[in-house]
């Protein structure tokens, strides 16, 4: 897992964890907007790291390695950790491990463990594996049918094609199997009071079980709904909004942190 750093001269540390089917440069439009104010730490996760050629391992292992890296480099407390989709799963487990104190955290469309029978979760993993494998083999034509072309340019889709070609079959399988079924401590106890779960209005139905899981296990979480963007679309399509919202989250005062609960949401 290669770690990329920007704005190292700043004290406030912000960790950005990318989703699946992307690489660390998923944040290429966000980094220039934040590196003049924050020390940004952007890991290239196993299986999506062109510098190591490794396969994806698991959500718990990646969360642990990320925390260990932060501790080894003197970051026992950070201003914020943000993760999208698969990255949101890593953030969820990272918070539960409580190795590093995060003053704030954002789980953007994050995947939580399925609360379903074992055989059902495996069938879902097989379906997801086959869909991504088809995209890997079918290339741009398949992706143009799968994604809304009025949101993503051909250049954006070519980027996804490049990432899919890099992903091994083992990485594809482990990504879905682990993101859908990763273990969490029981009970879930975190030491971060300022947590937000973000999701797009268009994916509200798809995130229903994830939202329910977060409400049950992280009751201090505030929910924010975004319109005019799809799952994981903020970094690529609205980087200014993402940077602005992360800055807002880090600026929430103690009164706001304790006064808003999981039954609340606000819309953008």
Q: For each predicted feature, which ranges?
A:
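Conserved HGGG/HGGXW glycine-rich cap/lid loop of the alpha/beta-hydrolase fold
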Residues: 4-52
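Active-site loop/oxyanion-hole signature of alpha/beta-hydrolase fold enzymes
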Residues: 41-80
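Gly/Ala-rich beta-loop-alpha elbow adjacent to hydrolase catalytic centers
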Residues: 83-91
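Flexible "cap/lid" loop of the alpha/beta hydrolase fold
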Residues: 96, 102-132
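Conserved alpha/beta-hydrolase catalytic His-Asp/Glu region
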Residues: 116-117, 136-189
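Short beta-strand/loop motif that positions the catalytic acidic residue
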Residues: 191, 196-199
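Acidic catalytic loop of the alpha/beta-hydrolase fold
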Residues: 201-206, 232
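Catalytic histidine-centered segment of alpha/beta-hydrolase-like enzymes
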Residues: 226-241
């Amino acid at each position: 897992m290669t770690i990329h750093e920007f704005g190292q001269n700043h004290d406030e540390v912000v960790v950005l964890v990318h989703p699946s089917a992307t690489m660390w440069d998923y944040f290429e439009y966000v980094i220039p907007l934040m590196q003049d104010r924050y020390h940004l730490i952007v890991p290239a996760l196993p299986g999506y790291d062109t510098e190591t050629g490794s396969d994806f391992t698991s959500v718990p292992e990646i969360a642990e390695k990320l925390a260990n890296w932060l501790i080894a480099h003197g970051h026992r407390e950070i201003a914020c950790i943000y993760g999208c989709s698969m990255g949101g799963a890593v953030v969820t487990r990272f918070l539960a491990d409580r190795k590093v104190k995060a003053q704030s955290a954002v789980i953007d469309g994050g995947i939580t463990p399925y609360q379903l029978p074992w055989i059902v979760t495996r069938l879902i993993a097989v379906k997801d594996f086959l869909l991504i494998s088809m995209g890997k083999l079918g290339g741009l034509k398949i992706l143009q049918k799968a994604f809304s072309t009025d949101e993503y340019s051909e250049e954006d889709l070519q980027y996804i094609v490049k990432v899919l070609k890099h992903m091994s079959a083992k990485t594809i399988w482990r990504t879905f199997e682990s993101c859908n079924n990763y273990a969490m401590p029981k009970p879930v106890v975190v030491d971060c009071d300022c947590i937000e779960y973000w999701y797009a209005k268009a994916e509200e139905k798809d995130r229903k079980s994830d939202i329910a899981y977060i409400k049950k296990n992280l009751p201090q979480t505030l929910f924010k709904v975004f319109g005019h963007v799809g799952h994981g679309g903020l970094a690529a399509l609205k980087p200014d909004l993402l940077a602005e919202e992360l800055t807002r989250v880090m600026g929430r005062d103690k009164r706001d942190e304790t006064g808003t609960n999981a039954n609340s949401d606000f819309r953008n």
